[in-house]
Each structure stands twice: as C-alpha cells, then as structure tokens.
Regions:
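Sec-dependent signal peptide recognition
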Residues: 41-48
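Beta-rich nucleic-acid/ligand-interaction surfaces
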Residues: 153-159, 272-279
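Low-complexity, intrinsically disordered or signal/transmembrane-proximal segments
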Residues: 23, 30-32
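Cysteine-centered motifs
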Residues: 12, 48-49
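Extracytoplasmic cell-surface/polysaccharide-interacting catalytic and binding patches
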Residues: 61-149, 161-267, 277-288
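Hydrophobic h-region of N-terminal signal peptides that target proteins for export
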Residues: 50-57
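Cationic, amphipathic, low-complexity segments that mediate targeting or membrane/lipid association
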Residues: 8-12, 19
Length: 288
C-alpha cells in the first residue's frame, strides 16, 4: 500500500505527523521473518528505526523548503521606505546581532522593540561589502559582525533621556546638536567573528555552524573606559591590560574598514564612520 506521506506532512502539525510516523512501520509494512528469533527481532527493530529516520528527514526537508521568511517589522519596512538597505542583502556572509535589541548594552534597556535587521544607506552598505572583502582576503577565516547600524533619531532621543546628567552622557550624541552619524545611516558598531561556513578538505566545519561569537578584542563593545581608546592601545599593552592578540585583531578590523573608506572613532575601537559630521549635515537626511 502506498501512503502519500509528503502530502500528509504538508497539511498536519508536528504532533499529528509524529503520531503517524510512529505507527507507519507497523501498519503499512509487512516483515518477512524466517524464524522468530532475537536476532531477527533485532533486525526488524533496526529497520523500523532506519525508516523513522528517513521519514523525519523528509519532514525536515519539507519544513525547510516550505518555511516562510520572517516577516519584516513596521520599523524595518519604514527603514526601507527611507531608502535604507538591509546589509545582509548586500554584504555576503556578514553577521548581525543588534545590541540595542537586547538589554545587555550600556543603557541596560531594550531600545529596538521591533528592529532585528541592520540597515544602512546603500553607499555605506557597499563600502561595508568592500571591508568584508578586504578582511577575508587577509584573514579568510574571519567575518565582520555588526552590533549597531542606522539608529532612528527617535531612539537616539530615548537614549539621551536615559543618560542625560550622568557620566554616560559623553557617549551619546545629543539630539539637540543634530545627533550622530548612526542617525544618518553612516556609521556602524562592528567587530570580528569566526566564519561559520568554512570547511576542511575533509568537509568538516572549521567552526560550529552556530558559532559566530565575536573574537575577544580586549573589551566588550560599548565598554565605557580608556581600554576602548584606540590611541592608548600601546600603553595598555605595555601595562598588560591588553594582549598582543587584542592589538592584532583591532588592527585587522581597522585595516579592513579603512580600506573601504571608514574612519574609527578614537575613543571606541568598534565605532566606524563613513562620512564626517559636516558632510552628513550638508548632504544627507537624518533618519527620524
């Protein structure tokens, strides 16, 4: 008897599929047994297990094939209406983990309620693509990882309201003064991570498929202190506060970004601007 399992799998939920899958071998397969011995029982068990694995593999394949892309949020759709682009559609293999979509950032709050994609102006995204190419030409095992990109001025105002009057205020551009280059789509907060698509000659992944952890750079992104200052790196190394690996990785990041036209912010090793503030005010619009 032929059972149209693929059609069934597309129209049932997982619980229903699992139930039928467990019944499938016994209801639709007849095993020829020469003798009712423990050995034959063992082979029957192995055959059933193999069939179950095959069935669930087909279910997974169908789920992947029929999976719908995650719908874009209102903020993300609005970003695109402003002419901004999702950087993952421009920069091959780049990784994104927006730190203000979580609470583990220097303000300690979730600032991006429905923003998970990183957006930039098209020319900034194209420059980031060049930076990724430059990085992987020098270090094929690495990739860029973005922690923040375009930040709407409305969010900038919320951040300013949180830090105003505190020691943290020097790290947030005052909206009354025009904000910062994040508000124009002309800046990124970025680090290095391992690529998760490289394989050995034997086909083994060099790094776990889900391992896109940022490399240690001496401080976390958003660290408020002198160890994040680019100009003091050598002194921090001499004091033993930064390692040789930290200095090398920061240099690799700067080399790649500067090759594409970005400039590092001297007090934040992770922050890169694509234009000056004067250029932004003269030629670009703030993302509200």
């Amino acid at each position: 008897m032929e059972f149209p399992f693929a059609i069934f799998a597309e129209n049932c939920n997982f619980v229903e599929i699992a139930f039928v899958a467990t019944q499938f071998p016994l209801k639709f397969i007849q095993f020829h047994r020469f003798n009712p011995t423990p050995l034959n029982d063992f082979f029957m068990f192995i055959t059933c297990c193999a069939l179950l694995l095959s069935i669930f593999g087909e279910i997974h394949r169908l789920n992947v094939a029929n999976a719908k892309p995650i719908e874009k949020s209102p903020t993300e759709l609005w970003m695109e209406e402003q002419g901004l682009v999702d950087i993952t559609t421009v920069v091959p293999g780049i990784h994104v983990s927006l730190m203000y979509a979580r609470s583990d950032n220097f303000v300690g709050r979730v600032m991006y309620r429905d923003l998970r994609r990183a957006y930039l102006l098209p020319e900034t995204a194209e420059a980031l693509k060049k930076a990724q190419t430059a990085l992987q030409k020098a270090h094929p095992e690495l990739s860029l990882k973005v922690y923040d990109a375009t930040r709407p001025m409305s969010v900038q105002q919320q951040m300013w309201n949180i830090v105003a009057g505190t020691s943290k205020s020097i790290y947030v551009s005052n909206p009354k003064n025009g904000g910062g280059l994040h508000n124009y789509g002309l800046a990124v907060d970025i680090t290095l991570c391992w690529r998760n698509d490289l394989r050995t000659a034997q086909g083994k992944l060099l790094h776990a498929a889900g391992d896109t952890t940022g490399l240690s750079m001496g401080t976390p992104i958003d660290y408020l202190g002198k160890m994040a200052h680019v100009r003091d790196e050598t002194a921090h190394f001499q004091r033993g506060w930064l390692s040789k690996a930290h200095l090398e990785r920061r240099k690799w990041l700067r080399n790649a970004m500067e090759a594409a036209g970005f400039k590092v912010l001297p007090t934040e090793w992770w922050h890169f601007n694509f234009k000056t503030r004067a250029q932004a005010k003269a030629h670009y619009k703030i993302v509200r």
